[in-house]
């Protein structure tokens, strides 16, 4: 006769259990039997890092060697119910009763670092962390537990990563270094205009790398203009050649694609250029461009599918508009361009296109750079406007119509006001959409294994170890809910995830005070809180904001405008004037911000800035001489480059 498993425990219900005092049930191999106190770590200072590391290695080894491990307490009714469940299934378990070992409290501390779970029971099945009592019964009811318990269970891979972008590749390479069998699935669905690319994800192919190179190309044009004031003489007409630039950039990107493939090969990571989709627990279907399907299994999975540009959902958008997916490899100069959107992608692209001498208009629905400091955002927009970029504020497109075919052709755009009934129309050669990005999570079979996503955004909620609600599935990169959408963040979180999964480290990714830079013609770098967010969190009366305008030395001889570049720090007055927000608008803002971000990690204060001797003459030194507060209302305009 089949044995019926016990029912899932209700809230606060312990239920009857054999040998309630010890929690011992048939089929449970108790590693520390009652009456014999065991020690898992070597004697010595109870909190020494060496002893703690030895204990962690011991626990990881126990988990990896065991089919089922239950970290329990003999008197805990929920632990007893879990042991009853496995007993009813005829499964022998390794049980460690933490109240019956000398260092049980330390074991529980280290377990909480490994699993982000502070309570018992704490259950692992075939190296997969299932969770506590409720999660174990949920896994049983969904069929996941039975899948994990299959006899002689052998997966094709220790880890399969879906997505070959920055986060996925970082995780894959680190897992391989740790001796694990790893596969990366990566497939680029062509854009509506037919654009696709190689291994490396958005950043390398259609994001950070080509964007920064085109930004640099535009800066070189400005440098040519400035050079005459510095004595350079040339007679040839200066003009920009789009085809020459894009060919050089695409050649560089191709070399990076090849480098990634070579790196995976050297680390024995299997790379499959196929579209990955879950079909059942621990099993995935890989479909290549020919439609051929192959199935793979793995003990654990990482979702790193990234995002793709959003479309407007209006007549003509997918037929005639392009996005950042298409721009960087466009085989012809885009000509007169309408950029739709006010994201950092929109403003960066508008900035370098204008820098090439093109006629550029930005259509803005509401505010610039949503999520960034709005004072800084408006200064970014103001500088762009002064340098030839036109802005259409409070309008949205409602139709795009092709007037002429060509490379480029001609498009008519009809737009309406967001504040009334006014409509406008304009003719452009190219319409570039940069209105946001959507997570690539809705068509990879997550619903088949029960992974939860935010239905509105498509983002995946995870805990602080990047674990989804399904124990063996993790996620990294831009698809994470409420995390920065930045390449270095994905790289760091992917690497640390692999180290935690395979016992090399307990370190978690720190998502606080992550620096970033908007590469508009005048760069905007920041770290920490915007002024609006700081006021919301700390209240205005608890803050002191120091700011100033400045004039870079290299702009003076060239005759470029003074009192345009701007620096600002936001300090918490009641925490030793700790810097909680750093903002700079100026040349090389990204390079300036990086070092200050490290200082903020170390608890940078206003006094530490004052005590720092600046490097003269540089833009960064302005932060060592900040004196004027916003609350004072004093004038911050500068008469010369040295203040």
Swiss-Prot record:
Q: Enter cross-link residues for Cysteinyl-selenocysteine (Cys-Sec).
A: 641-642
**What is the name listed in the Swiss-Prot or TrEMBL entry for this protein?**
Thioredoxin reductase 3
- Which residues of this protein are catalytic? 616
InterPro entries linked: FAD/NAD-bd_sf, FAD/NAD-binding_dom, FAD/NAD-linked_Rdtase_dimer_sf, Glutaredoxin, Glutaredoxin_euk/vir, GSHR/TRXR-like, Pyr_nucl-diS_OxRdtase_dimer, Pyr_OxRdtase_I_AS
Could you give the subunit structure recorded for this chain?
Answer: Homodimer.
Which stretches make up the Glutaredoxin domain? Answer: 56-156
Gene3D superfamilies assigned to the protein according to its UniProt record, in alphabetical order: 3.30.390.30, FAD/NAD(P)-binding domain, Glutaredoxin
- Origin organism is Homo sapiens (Human)
Show the CDD domains listed in the entry: GRX_GRXh_1_2_like
List the GO cellular component terms.
Answer: cytoplasm; cytosol; endoplasmic reticulum; mitochondrion; nucleoplasm
Q: Which family does it belong to?
A: Belongs to the class-I pyridine nucleotide-disulfide oxidoreductase family.
Q: Which residues carry this modification: Omega-N-methylarginine?
A: 26
């Amino acid at each position: 006769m089949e044995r019926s498993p016990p029912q899932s425990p209700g809230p606060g219900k312990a239920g009857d259990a054999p040998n309630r005092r010890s929690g011992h049930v048939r089929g449970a191999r108790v590693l520390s039997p009652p009456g014999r106190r065991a020690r898992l770590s070597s004697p010595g200072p109870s909190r020494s890092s060496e002893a703690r590391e030895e204990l962690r290695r011991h626990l990881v080894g126990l988990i990896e060697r065991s089919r089922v491990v239950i970290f329990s307490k003999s008197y805990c009714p929920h632990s007893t119910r879990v042991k009853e469940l496995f007993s009813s299934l005829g499964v022998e378990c390794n049980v460690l009763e933490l109240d019956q070992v000398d260092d049980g409290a330390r074991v529980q501390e280290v377990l909480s670092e490994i699993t982000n779970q502070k309570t018992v029971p704490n259950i692992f099945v075939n190296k997969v962390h299932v969770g506590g009592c409720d999660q174990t019964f949920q896994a049983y009811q969904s069929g996941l537990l039975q899948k994990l318990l299959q006899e002689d269970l052998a997966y094709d891979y220790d880890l399969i990563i879906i997505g070959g972008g920055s986060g996925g590749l970082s995780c894959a390479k680190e897992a391989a270094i740790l001796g694990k069998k790893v596969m990366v699935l990566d497939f680029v669905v062509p854009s509506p205009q037919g654009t696709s690319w190689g291994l490396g994800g958005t950043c390398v192919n259609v994001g950070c790398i080509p964007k920064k190179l085109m930004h640099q190309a535009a800066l070189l044009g400005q440098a040519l203009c400035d050079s005459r004031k510095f004595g350079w003489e040339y007679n040839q007409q200066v003009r920009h050649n789009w085809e020459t630039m894009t060919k050089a950039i695409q050649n560089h990107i191709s070399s990076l694609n090849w480098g990634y493939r070579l790196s995976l090969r050297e680390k024995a990571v299997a790379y499959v250029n196929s579209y990955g989709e879950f079909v059942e627990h621990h099993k995935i279907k890989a479909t290549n461009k020919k439609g051929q399907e192959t199935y793979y299994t793995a003990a654990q999975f990482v979702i790193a599918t990234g995002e793709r540009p959003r479309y407007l959902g209006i007549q003509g958008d997918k037929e005639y508009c392009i996005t950042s997916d298409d721009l960087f490899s466009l085989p012809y100069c885009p000509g007169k361009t309408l950029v739709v959107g006010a994201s950092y992608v929109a403003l960066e692209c508008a900035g370098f296109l204008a820098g090439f001498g093109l006629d550029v208009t930005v259509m803005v629905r509401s505010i610039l750079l949503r999520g960034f400091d709005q004072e800084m955002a408006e200064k970014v927009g103001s500088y762009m406007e002064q340098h030839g970029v036109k802005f259409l504020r409070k309008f949205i497109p409602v139709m795009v119509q092709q007037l002429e075919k060509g490379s480029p052709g001609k498009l008519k755009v009809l737009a309406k006001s967001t504040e009334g009934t006014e409509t406008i129309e304009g003719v452009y050669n190219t319409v570039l959409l940069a209105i946001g990005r959507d997570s690539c999570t809705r068509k990879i079979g997550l619903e088949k294994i029960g992974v939860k996503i935010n239905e509105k955004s498509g983002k995946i909620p995870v805990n602080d170890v990047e674990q989804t609600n399904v124990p063996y599935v993790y996620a990294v990169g831009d698809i994470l809910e409420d995390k920065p959408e930045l390449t270095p963040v994905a790289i760091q979180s992917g690497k640390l995830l692999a180290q935690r999964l395979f016992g090399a480290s307990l370190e978690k990714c720190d998502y606080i005070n992550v620096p970033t830079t908007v590469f508009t013609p005048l760069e905007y770098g920041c770290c920490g809180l915007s002024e609006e967010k700081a006021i919301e969190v700390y209240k205005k009366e608890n803050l002191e904001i120091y700011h100033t305008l400045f004039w870079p030395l290299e702009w003076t001889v060239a005759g470029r405008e003074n009192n345009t570049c701007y620096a600002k720090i936001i300090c918490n007055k009641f925490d030793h004037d700790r810097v909680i927000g750093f903002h700079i608008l100026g040349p090389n803002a990204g390079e300036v911000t990086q070092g200050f971000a490290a200082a903020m990690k170390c608890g940078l204060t206003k006094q530490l800035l004052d005590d720092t001797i600046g490097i003269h003459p540089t833009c960064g030194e302005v932060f060592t001489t900040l004196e004027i507060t916003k609350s004072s209302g004093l004038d911050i305009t500068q008469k010369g480059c040295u203040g």
